[in-house]
Amino acid sequence: FFGDFGNISSAAAITGNPK
């Protein structure tokens, strides 16, 4: 996924974080 955190990249995408 395209996450800026890497660790919670997938989680961020689910929460609505396009980082």
From Swiss-Prot:
Q: State the family it belongs to.
A: Belongs to the globin family.
- Function field: Involved in oxygen transport from the lung to the various peripheral tissues.
> In the record, what terms sit under GO molecular function?
metal ion binding; oxygen carrier activity
The record's keywords, sorted A to Z, are: Heme, Iron, Metal-binding, Oxygen transport, Transport
Report the superkingdom from the record.
Eukaryota
Species this protein is from: Saara hardwickii (Indian spiny-tailed lizard)
> What are the transmembrane regions?
none
The entry describes its oligomerization and partners as: Heterotetramer of two alpha chains and two beta chains.
Q: Does the keyword Transport apply?
A: yes
Which tissues is this protein detected in according to the database? Red blood cells.
Q: What is this protein called?
A: Hemoglobin subunit beta-2
